Amino acid sequence: MSREINVNQMIDDSKLTPFHWRVIILSTLIIIFDGYDLVIYGVALPLLMKEWAIDPVTAGFIGSIALFGMMFGALIFGTIADKLEHLGVSRKKVIAVCIILFSLCTVLCGFSETTTQFSIFRFLAGVGIGGVMPNVIALVSEYAPKKFKSFFVTLMFSGYAIGGMTAAFLGSILVPLYGWKIMFMIAGIPLVLLLPLMKVLPESIDYLVRKKKDETVRFIMTKMVPSYQYQPDHVFVLNSSNQNQAQAPVKMIFQEQRAFSTMMFWCSIFMTLIMVYALGNWLPKLMIEAGYNLSKSLIFLFSLNVGGMIGSILGGYLADRYNVKFVTMGLLLLGAISLSLLSFQFSSVILYILIACAGAASIGAQIMLLAYMAKFYAPNVRSTGIGWGLGMGRVGAILGPILTGWLLSLQLPHFYNFLALSIPAVLGIVTVFLINDRRMYQPEPISPIANQNDTTTVKVNEAVSH
């Protein structure tokens, strides 16, 4: 008589092991590549505008091209990853395709000789960048113990800020010496690391169970739950909501009275992405306009991403102990205050602190929203929900650089530029508050192991001793 082993429940109840850290470190590395490729446009922008005689409005549109690609990437790759598993296209393969796409096209940007060529490659790179995010989030969420889910997702996405910090730091050293193209050449490193990375990154556990790859599942479960002892009568199963993931349509993210909250997630991401990409693309130029040189302006961008990393990790830690909604709202409030204060004149040290706070708020709140969605949606629609949230919210990312370029073209006093950027933070507080947590996914309270033909509950501590 067979005994069912619910792998999702065992992972939810597991304690942290080296295998968990392997998943989070490798996933964070992917997001570091992602963040670097996205931020380097802001690093190169001052020299690009000078070399190609680009006006602020045109520069804003070029900056939004990659974000437009990210919208398509998130919508396409976020959705098809939940549908293609029955064709043998695993989530890890989708991630690999996205890495190749954004790395190769970013390198090709460095060989561009016209704004048209540059824009085409930035768009294609954006498709890859946008596609990798929902799939890596879904992968990490599958392997994260329940009490660490928010922390794992936000820790992983602190890699975006690390990538931005790396781009800003290297840019402050290399760009004045070698020009802007060197930054795009460095983006080819993921292509070299791809094969070893894919070899050690585990496949989606849900995919492995559905495909009956029992030997691999058994190996992973013994790594994640060392006390688990496999028996020949054990049969690996998933939560009922995970079983038919490949057949999950987009409409499911609107069902069970989730439609309004789904729309509020979209609006919240829209607001945070306006801030993230307006600052990420234009902060060096804004600080140059305020009277700082190129190297120092790039250090301000470095400070923004340092704040983003701290805000992401701290926010994830707090979200697993308190309400993720109010942690996100608190970060947005910090953003509204710090961006408003940037409108005034302060010493460089105070400016660094305020910009770091703005990074914690904008980047941190954006990443908190991704962790929020990972908890809100059931596993069978998680990648779809996150992908569509990122895709629809990308409209804000697209508008952010364009609107900031338009603001600069008006040549308004420095005061108004940052004051305008604080408005999305205020609106974001409202939209996050309106998300209905009563519609959040609740996994069924079942034992990790039960008799397939007997519904009698087996105690959890017995699950690892049979």
UniProtKB/Swiss-Prot annotation:
Residues 44-60, 115-119, 172-181, 280-297, 347-348, 409-414 are periplasmic. PANTHER family: CARBOXYLIC ACID TRANSPORTER PROTEIN HOMOLOG. The gene is benK. This is Benzoate transport protein. The keyword Transport applies. GO terms for molecular function: carboxylic acid transmembrane transporter activity. PROSITE patterns: MFS (PS50850). The chain crosses the membrane at residues 23-43, 61-81, 94-114, 120-140, 151-171, 182-202, 259-279, 298-318, 326-346, 349-369, 388-408, 415-435. The lineage of its organism: Bacteria, Pseudomonadati, Pseudomonadota, Gammaproteobacteria, Moraxellales. GO terms for cellular component: plasma membrane. It is found in: Cell inner membrane. Probable uptake of benzoate. InterPro entries: MFS, MFS_AAHS, MFS_dom, MFS_trans_sf, Sugar_transporter_CS. Keywords: Cell inner membrane, Cell membrane, Membrane, Transmembrane, Transmembrane helix, Transport. The keyword Transport applies. Belongs to the major facilitator superfamily. Aromatic acid:H(+) symporter (AAHS) (TC 2.A.1.15) family. Residues 1-22, 82-93, 141-150, 203-258, 319-325, 370-387, 436-466 are cytoplasmic. It is a multi-pass membrane protein. It comes from the Bacteria.
